[in-house]
Regions:
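N-terminal capping segments
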Residues: 1-54, 80
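...with weaker cross-activation on analogous glycine-rich loops/strands in unrelated enzymes
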Residues: 41-101
Length: 101
């Protein structure tokens, strides 16, 4: 899997909205890392959040996250992660189970 820069990652993620390559149900972390062409590094969004060094974490509203950032949410169970676009979040399962929006 080739690594992608921010523009390429967001383009790939936007393509998944209109031309999905798979069902992304409960695969938010897989979707986000796939957008950048990254290999698996943790079994869930919450596990990856806990692996990130404190000095690399930015707490605050999702709107303040930089473009291309992973935005984490403390949902019950595995947590949730989305990808920050310019003015919105690209997420799995938000609009419909398994879909990207």
């Amino acid at each position: 899997m080739a690594h992608r820069d921010i523009d390429q990652a967001l383009a790939w993620a936007n393509d998944e909205i209109h031309h999905p390559t798979r069902d992304w149900h409960e695969l938010c972390l897989s979707f986000c890392r796939s957008s950048y062409g990254l290999p698996p590094v943790a079994p869930s969004a919450i596990d990856l959040w806990h692996k990130i060094p404190h000095h690399h974490k930015h707490h605050g509203p999702a709107e303040a996250a930089p473009r291309g950032a992973f935005v984490y949410f403390d949902y019950p169970g595995a947590g949730h992660v989305t990808l920050k676009a310019r003015h919105t979040l690209i997420s799995t399962d938000y609009c419909h189970p398994g879909k990207v929006c």
